[in-house]
Curated annotation (Swiss-Prot):
GO terms for molecular function: ATP binding; ATP-dependent protein folding chaperone. The lineage of its organism: Eukaryota, Metazoa, Ecdysozoa, Arthropoda, Hexapoda. InterPro entries: ATPase_NBD, Heat_shock_70_CS, Hsp_70_fam. PANTHER family: HEAT SHOCK PROTEIN 70KDA (PTHR19375). The gene is Hsc70-1. This is Heat shock 70 kDa protein cognate 1. It comes from Drosophila simulans. It comes from the Eukaryota. Keywords: ATP-binding, Nucleotide-binding, Stress response. PROSITE patterns: HSP70_1 (PS00297). Belongs to the heat shock protein 70 family.
Length: 214
């Protein structure tokens, strides 16, 4: 009797994906945009609900109604110090209902052995360690640099922060294959252009404890 294929779904903090195991190998399934990962974003407009790439692509124009990082709230109280820290990076509003979390979740990673059936060997993870954590460190670093250079605090401007975060995401990807990345944002805040660069060594220094925790 031929073996049936198995489907695995990764609902990640930042990105989600679906894979199928068949013919002895795993294949990651592309979404309707042709991408193998889908941003864990949902957005609400006056006429529709957007999910994934469509939601993330319009976040700069609709920051207050675009939700992401939802997994960071799982199992935590609203007054949790970690939640309060994360809220500084969210353009949308989060609020409490009796101070209690309304959703729960499980760990992120499971190790299985697959023969005739499957056996779970280990389960572990950290719902509060994802790509956004690395982005946040770089965003905070550049917010401080902008204030030091120009004497302006863009930390409370949601649109400026979103543009800066998008640039940081691109820089992070560049640093995976290059030793330095440039960040150039015209009229980032109050008409001030922001041009800077970050080295891979500096990025690793900013995120040293996160790398050690992976």
């Amino acid at each position: 009797m031929p073996k049936l294929p198995a489907v695995g779904i990764d609902l990640g903090t930042t990105y989600s994906c679906v894979g199928v195991f068949q013919h002895g190998k795993v294949e990651i399934i592309a979404n309707d945009q042709g991408n193998r990962t889908t941003p864990s974003y949902v957005a609400f407009t006056e006429s529709e609900r957007l999910i994934g790439d469509a939601a993330k692509n319009q976040v700069a124009m609709n920051p207050n109604n675009t939700i992401f990082d939802a997994k960071r709230l799982i199992g935590r109280r609203f007054d949790d110090a970690t939640v309060q820290s994360d809220m500084k990076h969210w353009p949308f509003e989060a609020f409490a209902e009796n101070g209690k979390p309304r959703i729960r979740g499980t760990f992120d990673v499971s190790v299985l052995t697959i023969e005739d059936g499957f056996e779970v060997k280990a389960t572990a993870g950290d719902t509060h360690l994802g790509r956004e954590d690395f982005d946040n460190r770089l965003v905070n670093h550049l917010v401080q640099e902008f204030q030091r250079k120009h004497g302006k605090d863009l930390g409370q401007n949601k649109r400026a922060l979103r543009r800066l975060r998008t640039a940081c995401e691109r820089a992070k990807r560049t640093l995976s294959s290059s030793t330095q990345a440039s960040i150039e944002i015209d009229s980032l805040f109050e008409g001030v252009d922001f041009y800077t660069s970050v080295t891979r060594a500096r990025f690793e220094e900013l995120n040293g404890d996160l790398f050690r925790g992976t």
